[in-house]
Amino acid sequence: MFFPIDASRADMSWYLKVIEQVATQGHMDALALVDTFGVLSPHAVRYFVRHTRERIKKPLETHFHMDFGMGVANTVIAVAEGAEVIHSTISGIGERAGNAPTEDTLLALLTMYGVDTGIKTERLTKLSRYVRKIGRLAMPANRQIVGDTLFDIESGIIASWYKNAAKDHFLEVFPFHPNLVGQRMPRVVLGKNSGLDSIRIHLDRIRVKATDDQVNDILLRVKAASLKKKGLLDDKEFRRIVKQAVRS
């Protein structure tokens, strides 16, 4: 595989001459489309791939970085234009902002384009956590696909939606089922953005009955406590609030 580093920033006519010469006079079993510094846009990738394919008839591979957050989109566009091999890394580890994340790329191809790579996507979350552990890598808890809190529901309006629709129409509430990537099932959490149904869900969980006025009082107390704590409330804190509100 011929890997012309930083090809995306080279003069296009010069680049095309170089790859054509290597393809005809040297040894090239495949060509990597290399965007070393992640500077290409999806529109530029389409142009890049089409002109490359017009010049040489070799299998194309993608190698895109995430410096501007375009690595996954660029990879998908390149595949749609005929690239056959994808270079990606688990959770996007790599130089600077990293490479196109494997998880994101796989899910985009599978759910948006119907491309099944044969990879067992239900193992992605476990694999990502393992890589993070051995690599001592920090990652946002709400990271797409494999984040630890990705399926937490704090917003009151989403909690109501989940309560009313998820049992029979799960994909009305989420873009994909957590089982698809080995994630846990959703949970409603309690914080400053909670709503009345958030409270009702947790009251049902701990088997406490409350009037509408008490539910509203509990919600106000939950919001105030969350703002003071600057974070979500745990079960012990919620039970304490419920005890205070139901007694008063």
Which positions does each model-derived feature cover?
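Predominant activation on well-ordered alpha-helical scaffold segments within soluble catalytic domains
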Residues: 16-20, 46-53, 73-80, 87, ...
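C-terminal helical cap(s) of enzyme catalytic domains, especially alpha/beta-barrels
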Residues: 94-120, 124
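Active-site-proximal loop/turn and secondary-structure-junction residues that shape catalytic pockets
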Residues: 4-9, 35-39, 64-70, 90-94
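Glycine-rich phosphate-binding active-site loops on the catalytic face of alpha/beta enzymes
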Residues: 81-98
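A mid-to-C-terminal "edge-of-domain" accessory segment
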Residues: 114-248
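Conserved structured core elements
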Residues: 12, 16, 30, 39-46, ...
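Beta-strand segments within the central parallel beta-sheet cores of soluble alpha/beta enzyme folds
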Residues: 32-33, 61-64, 88-89, 118-127
